Amino acid sequence: MKRLMMKNMPASWSLWCLVLLWAFGTNIPLASADEAIQLDPALKSYSKVSGVSGSIGSIGSDTLNNLLTLWAEGFRKQYPNVKIEIEGKGSSTAPPALIEGMALLGPMSRTMKNSEIDAFERKFRYKPTAIPVAIDALAVYVNKDNPVQGLTMAQLDAIFSKSRRWGHNENIQLWKQTGLNDDFGNSPISIYGRNSASGTYGFFKEHALKNGDYKDEVKEQPGSASVVQSVSEDQTGIGYSGIGYLTSNVRIVPLAEKEGAPFKEASQQNSDNGSYPLWRHLYLYVNKAPNKPLDLIVREFIKFIYSKEGQRLVVKDGFFPLKADLIERELRKLD
């Protein structure tokens, strides 16, 4: 599983300059787990149809930027005259873009908040449609030289949050408070995270902090790659980002739900069975009126994403593919 990772990636680009953007990246991520990531053998190949033309705009999640780029490239091999423009400033930018008609696709690394759904429904009198497109294990990264072998969710919460809603008995500021006894244990913990526009920020706040408050010491980064890059350059650093951003200079820390429970790797199997605490779906939101099919170009783009070729690109980008039975259910939403 290889992909080029784009550091300091601009928020908006068109496919006409993708090759140049890919050349800008320098890190080559490794496999996200010891096991090989498996495609469901029941996935179907994409079948090209006639009449597909025009353009698609996508505004939303930074986490999905690279994957959308790969999907767009693959789709344009089928339909060379199609243009796809992608802007990734964070999941919170997707709902207003859909409401205002600025984009046909709203990629998000979390589900929409009730307030976002309500705003959409006030304008259109129906709800937005959520399309799961991949599985991500939101990973906790440390520097490759950090010897920590695992963290409980309570410890993770006590590192990142001043609220400590998982019930840990003390604020964790030093690595020795996680069980490290060597010289490394006396090091203060440097904390890296995303900004509040990010869906990853919101997902981590909800699931890792139980909606507690982040510590003021968290160094907010503009993108997923920036978090991992910062941790790779800081021996005492810790941060969270999508599993597709793993590089050779960081490690992913296994997590346990509680003290004494087994640590779970951020693997495909543990994400599929729900035992990894921070697994999530990644979504595309679309504006689909009831009893009315999506525009042909949008419908076919989603069908390509759901094809064997599209889910193979999910694996290429470091995320986990969907099962064929889920895809069959979701495809029925498109008509």
Question: Whereabouts are the PLM-identified features?
Answer:
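N-terminal secretory signal peptides that target proteins for export/translocation
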Residues: M1-P10
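Glycine-centered signal
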Residues: R3, L30-A31
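Bacterial N-terminal signal peptides
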Residues: S14-N27
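Flexible loop/hinge segments at secondary-structure junctions
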Residues: S32-D335
